[in-house]
A protein has these predicted regions:
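Phosphate-handling active-site elements
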Residues: 78-89, 115-132, 136
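N-terminal beta-alpha supersecondary unit
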Residues: 2-86
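Short clusters of hydrophobic/aromatic residues that line enzyme substrate/ligand-binding pockets
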Residues: 29, 55, 62-63, 98, ...
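Short, charged, solvent-exposed linker or helix-capping segments at domain edges/interfaces
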Residues: 53-55, 102, 180-186
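ATP-dependent small-molecule kinase catalytic core of the GHMP/sugar-kinase superfamily
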Residues: 2-31, 122-188
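Broad, structure-driven detector of short, well-ordered beta-strand segments within folded domains
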Residues: 42-44, 89-92, 149-152
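Short pre-catalytic strand/loop immediately N-terminal to key active-site residues, enriched for Gly-Thr
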Residues: 88-100
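DPxDG-like acidic metal-binding loop motif
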Residues: 70, 100-130, 142
Length: 188
């Protein structure tokens, strides 16, 4: 049994342009994304035996079944790597508010994917990991590098840039109000 504690940080969009929807259902975007110091905490246990993924979450509004992006990450990693599924448990302590455009789920997925890759001997290099991340979600590749970047295409074109912002930011998210990323993009 191997235990890990990882912190998956949020991101902000410093401007976001959303363009036409492609035939595959994804929109092209152009955005500047920057990581921020607000993180979820994940306690992850690898049991060194065959099995499945079990997710628990401090936020009861977050699904812990196949609808959770961590399941998609787990499934895609094992399918693509051709490794047998191992029993893994994740306890997700949420601090990043959901439905706030801060990339909480994508961050969880990106950091979990990086840990899976490391745990199984760095099967993928960074570029391959970004391509795998794109199969999970369009914000997930950003969290592979997790540095300020201009993100374009469908989220798959990531160009690191210098972050000269020195000011602090204040984020305000109403408690009982949010917009899912999927719903926001469907309005375009």
């Amino acid at each position: 049994m191997n235990k890990y504690k990882i912190f998956s940080n949020a991101k902000i969009n410093i401007g976001l342009n959303v363009f036409q929807k492609e035939d595959d259902g994804y929109h092209n975007i152009d955005s500047i994304m920057a990581p921020i110091d607000l993180s979820d905490e994940m306690d992850i246990i690898f049991y060194s035996e065959l099995g499945d993924l079990k997710i628990e979450c401090s936020d009861k509004n977050i699904p812990t079944d196949e609808r959770n992006i961590l399941y998609k990450t787990y499934k895609i990693f094992f399918e693509e790597s051709k490794k047998e599924k191992e029993k893994i448990s994740v306890f997700l302590k949420k601090s990043i508010p959901s439905e706030a455009g801060l990339g909480g789920g994508s961050s969880n997925a990106g950091f979990f994917l990086k840990l899976l890759n490391k745990y199984y001997g760095n099967i993928y290099n960074e570029k391959e990991l970004e391509e795998l991340a794109m199969k999970i979600g369009s914000d997930v590749p950003f969290f592979i590098k997790n540095k300020t970047a201009r993100v374009s295409g469908k989220g798959n074109k990531i160009e690191l840039i210098e972050n000269n912002l020195k000011d602090s930011i204040i984020l305000i998210k109403p408690i009982n109000f949010g917009v899912s990323t999927k719903e926001a993009y469907e309005s375009f």
